[in-house]
Amino acid sequence: MPSSLLGAAMPASTSAAALQEALENAGRLIDRQLQEDRMYPDLSELLMVSAPNNPTVSGMSDMDYPLQGPGLLSVPNLPEISSIRRVPLPPELVEQFGHMQCNCMMGVFPPISRAWLTIDSDIFMWNYEDGGDLAYFDGLSETILAVGLVKPKAGIFQPHVRHLLVLATPVDIVILGLSYANLQTGSGVLNDSLSGGMQLLPDPLYSLPTDNTYLLTITSTDNGRIFLAGKDGCLYEVAYQAEAGWFSQRCRKINHSKSSLSFLVPSLLQFTFSEDDPILQIAIDNSRNILYTRSEKGVIQVYDLGQDGQGMSRVASVSQNAIVSAAGNIARTIDRSVFKPIVQIAVIENSESLDCQLLAVTHAGVRLYFSTCPFRQPLARPNTLTLVHVRLPPGFSASSTVEKPSKVHRALYSKGILLMAASENEDNDILWCVNHDTFPFQKPMMETQMTAGVDGHSWALSAIDELKVDKIITPLNKDHIPITDSPVVVQQHMLPPKKFVLLSAQGSLMFHKLRPVDQLRHLLVSNVGGDGEEIERFFKLHQEDQACATCLILACSTAACDREVSAWATRAFFRYGGEAQMRFPTTLPPPSNVGPILGSPVYSSSPVPSGSPYPNPSFLGTPSHGIQPPAMSTPVCALGNPATQATNMSCVTGPEIVYSGKHNGICIYFSRIMGNIWDASLVVERIFKSGNREITAIESSVPCQLLESVLQELKGLQEFLDRNSQFAGGPLGNPNTTAKVQQRLIGFMRPENGNPQQMQQELQRKFHEAQLSEKISLQAIQQLVRKSYQALALWKLLCEHQFTIIVAELQKELQEQLKITTFKDLVIRDKELTGALIASLINCYIRDNAAVDGISLHLQDICPLLYSTDDAICSKANELLQRSRQVQNKTEKERMLRESLKEYQKISNQVDLSNVCAQYRQVRFYEGVVELSLTAAEKKDPQGLGLHFYKHGEPEEDIVGLQAFQERLNSYKCITDTLQELVNQSKAAPQSPSVPKKPGPPVLSSDPNMLSNEEAGHHFEQMLKLSQRSKDELFSIALYNWLIQVDLADKLLQVASPFLEPHLVRMAKVDQNRVRYMDLLWRYYEKNRSFSNAARVLSRLADMHSTEISLQQRLEYIARAILSAKSSTAISSIAADGEFLHELEEKMEVARIQLQIQETLQRQYSHHSSVQDAVSQLDSELMDITKLYGEFADPFKLAECKLAIIHCAGYSDPILVQTLWQDIIEKELSDSVTLSSSDRMHALSLKIVLLGKIYAGTPRFFPLDFIVQFLEQQVCTLNWDVGFVIQTMNEIGVPLPRLLEVYDQLFKSRDPFWNRMKKPLHLLDCIHVLLIRYVENPSQVLNCERRRFTNLCLDAVCGYLVELQSMSSSVAVQAITGNFKSLQAKLERLH
């Protein structure tokens, strides 16, 4: 038991969490008890048979039949069967015996509650319950040899023919129909009135010859097959069908012992001189589809009818000698004469045992158990017949005082009960009853026995078909439900005692096999009260907890006839139910949980497993000395860790609380009431056909009748607990609890030198601690009983309505949840589901225009824990809301909606907010959505813990704050979801009503209430305005976040609220999506003309290290920041703003270079992974020029970018600059190598012009001399046009005088390169081109400079002519000389 439940009894104000924990603990107790009830042993385990090849024997030990030994006086006088009720034969029948000539037989047909008698060729039937309703058939002329009642095959006869009566004579087999006028459907019980009961149809349905086969017995299977036993030792079957076919007759006889075609060959005079072994008995196991036969000589044969019951094959045959030999080898000390003859065989169905299939009873009362297949294989087909156990009857143990059975001539075995009719003398029988109902969990098997005298010879002995409660097997519990039926003690609260009928010539003898509860009732009535030695012995025999559970069946009975017995049972419950105890660790073995039943109390060397309710064989051992322990049950650790428990007084750290029999009896009884449904699925899916469609419906897994029965039992238990609230106090009628405290502290070791007074106080404290723990547990169980009753009452109410429709109203998720929910879950933890089911039920009323007040009051009456006053308010509000849908008057509709809103607001913290808001949306009551959601948020978090949690950074350790925060957000979500719906609708593409989707008449819109785009937009604006009025800061924040999320930032920026700026600032600092919030923040500042703040936010955005922002966006942010900064400086003249603007402009310059680097890398090296990483890096942040140069421009050899960086930095290094220009030119030439010469010249010219225009104004970064020289060398090398460089420089805008100066210096430098290239006149050609351009267009030089430049040109030409004259004459020299002389003349004309 958790420590939280040990402090004190649960007060009314106990928290919901503590109540829930108590319920969970109570549920676990029930789970454990239910599991223990289901762990009953199989018959093979009771018989200690582990496998077919390991046979065992029992019956020779005193403990096999505890009542046969000297312990008899210690056991209460418990009758096993009720007093016998004798019903004489109808007087008309007695007269018929005088007319008998050949033969008479008698038997019972339990399915129709009839006994039958044949006298020669006539058969009579009557109701054996009262001797009335006598019917007869005298339509046969031959003596009747065998009689059988058959439930016919389906679909062959008319529905009123419920059974067939099969009669066999020496000549033919006649099949008659039985119909019933007043048969109760499904009950199998005939109406007792003489006028309207059974009718025997006069004309036979079938008649076929016996072919001279003497038939001895007739039996049928549940599926309508008819088997007959022949005196010739053969097994026959009558096969019948509706109509004859080409190769089959309507009715024919098949001999399964010889040939399937034997009906074609008559057996003439077969039984006249036969030495065959007649078959005396046929037994059919309908649960496994196996048929057994027993012959006159004791041969047992096994036939497999197939998995589906339609086959037929003989699989085994064992002779009586083989059986006797096997039994003798198993029970070697027993005289073999008791093993034969076998007088009866009985099937053991799979509801009783999975491993044992057949029981044979001998004339001495010995039971022989057989198996037909390997153990633990429930689906295996029979393949053998193996004797696995020999059970001797009472009287074979050494100390037995009971006389052994003898001369058994008739036996009946049914569900563990063996009845044997033994001949006492010629006129009378002794009826033996042997069973293990008292000890169903005890291994090896222990049985009780009793005998009763029977007047007359027993002609027939039969069990009356009992009421059977169907197991509720569902997907959730199918693996936990045993295949075999629970013992009687587990089911006795809901099943009546088993009924038997014995027929003799004097009439029918009716009696019941008493259940333990019937035996207890007998003791209470006999003792006229709840006290007495016999009752105390009953409690010791069954153990306190099991006896208390049995006692509760009577104590909780609400029947008027049980009122006095109920009071006696209550007294016995409290008197003998024990007390809670504290068990201490001890060096002695723990006390057995077996009470002193037949002798002195003893300690068991190992306690019986918890929940094992029956005695341990050791209870007849040597008595031990010491405290006599009352019966105990599963202990619960009360204090500390059991591992630390000690045995002395100085360190009692780990005692265990052992609950009383009263406590455990209540648990057991409750678990047995609920056991059939506790862990079953609430619902099952069933598929049925509607026309050609298959429809899946969800139905209750438990029928109403069973619910009614469970509710009746639960109500009795609940009233008992409410009536006897003192059960958690001290022992009844024993106020002096301290006197016996030490007896309740099991294993407590008295300290040698302890203070007696101190020890007594400690003992008293421990005892009260155990009492308190039990009281708390019982209160939890009481609450569980109450909740269970109310949950099942609700479930029954749902079943009485249209359950399938109610469930269909649920949301799909809840329907799926329903499929995986057990009744236990529904009771303990599924309040949401019960609420939804109730809401669905009420909605069905509302939909049918029925008032909900009546059903609401009924719900409050039957399940107030599930349907409170608040729930009733909710139902009323829901009714108003639903009724408003029907109202056409706008004012009235608004009034009803307003009224519903007021009702909902009363319980807004409990209402299904999303559902109500969805309905408000449907009726366009958007104001209600906002108001109800905000009210709900306030009620769920009245102290504002959610906002506190949010503002303090959402600390993980603040669980309460987190819960309040989530509750508020869930409430706000209803508003934002509604806004979202309106947004979506306002943007939806309107459908053109003029264009039909398909041919035919116009189709109405599927939703006539759908909003138009304009209406949706209007409602959105109205709702947004209403939302903005809220003073709820956390809601405002939620609204802002939603607007951002759905890209309605423009709407957000229109909000005039004091909460907006702090929220954006906060989110820009802490949210993972900082970029988005900073972007909104600068826009907010800009909109509110706070330009300085906008510029600084934009600057932070540009500087932010983030992969969300591209480099291009960063440049845009800086550009926007510069604009805002300029606007700020225009408004105010703060020096800091001016400095900030300067910083922004410098930042922009560097950023552009960074962009240039990135674009260059993307353009030239995009396929390299390292380049891709570099490009991403350049996107992630703004870098300084040092980093750009060292980490990007230089490593990737980006000459242009390096030139831009040193230009930006103002760094002057002529050699570096020249190298960069050379790299730029060479890179461009390299990139264009595949192009034609003209294209290459064009590409290079574009590049030089582009860069020249940037750097020509700063000669340090545009070394003209070097560039012209390098370019001319490339032109010379590539044989390009002579004027290429001059044209390029002209496009850059280099002045002609400066260009002439450069070329003149190049020529005069006499670089050997030109001679090496064999073009010594190249530069003169270039100068000639340059000057010709001037002559042709003198305006290239300013007018004021023109004369001086012309003179300069003439002087230079003269110099060039002198140089040419000094050169050796050649065609090229002569040509250039002529060109310069012509030029000279033109220049002189310009002079």
UniProtKB/Swiss-Prot annotation:
Q: Which residues are glycosylated?
A: S526
Give one GO biological process term: mRNA export from nucleus
Q: Which Gene3D superfamilies match?
A: 1.20.58.1780, Nucleoporin, helical C-terminal domain (1.20.120.1880), Nucleoporin, helical domain, central subdomain (1.25.40.440), Nucleoporin, helical domain, N-terminal subdomain (1.25.40.450)
Q: Where is this cross-link: Glycyl lysine isopeptide (Lys-Gly) (interchain with G-Cter in SUMO2)?
A: K740
Disordered: region residues: 985-1012
Task: List the cysteine pairs that form cystine.
Answer: none
* Superkingdom in the source lineage: Eukaryota
PTM: Phosphorylated. Phosphorylation and dephosphorylation may be important for the function of NUP155 and may play a role in the reversible disassembly of the nuclear pore complex during mitosis. Disulfide-linked to NUP62. The inner channel of the NPC has a different redox environment from the cytoplasm and allows the formation of interchain disulfide bonds between some nucleoporins, the significant increase of these linkages upon oxidative stress reduces the permeability of the NPC.
Where in or outside the cell?
Nucleus, Nuclear pore complex; Nucleus membrane
Could you tell me in which tissues this protein is expressed?
A: Expressed in all tissues tested, including heart, brain, placenta, lung, liver, skeletal muscle, kidney and pancreas.
GO CC, any one term: membrane
- Modification type Phosphoserine: residues: S1057
According to Swiss-Prot or TrEMBL, what is its membrane topology? Answer: Peripheral membrane protein
Among InterPro entries, the record links this protein to: Nucleoporin_Nup133/Nup155_C, Nucleoporin_Nup133/Nup155_N, Nucleoporin_Nup155, Nucleoporin_Nup155_C_1, Nucleoporin_Nup155_C_2, Nucleoporin_Nup155_C_3
Keyword list (alphabetical) reads: Atrial fibrillation, Disease variant, Disulfide bond, Glycoprotein, Isopeptide bond, Membrane, mRNA transport, Nuclear pore complex, Nucleus, Phosphoprotein, Protein transport, Translocation, Transport, Ubl conjugation
Care to name a GO molecular-function term for this sequence? Answer: structural constituent of nuclear pore
The family line of this record is: Belongs to the non-repetitive/WGA-negative nucleoporin family.
Subunit annotation: Interacts with GLE1. Able to form a heterotrimer with GLE1 and NUP42 in vitro. Forms a complex with NUP35, NUP93, NUP205 and lamin B.
Q: What does this protein do?
A: Essential component of nuclear pore complex. Could be essessential for embryogenesis. Nucleoporins may be involved both in binding and translocating proteins during nucleocytoplasmic transport.
Associated clinical condition = Atrial fibrillation, familial, 15: A familial form of atrial fibrillation, a common sustained cardiac rhythm disturbance. Atrial fibrillation is characterized by disorganized atrial electrical activity and ineffective atrial contraction promoting blood stasis in the atria and reduces ventricular filling. It can result in palpitations, syncope, thromboembolic stroke, and congestive heart failure.
Q: What is this protein called?
A: Nuclear pore complex protein Nup155
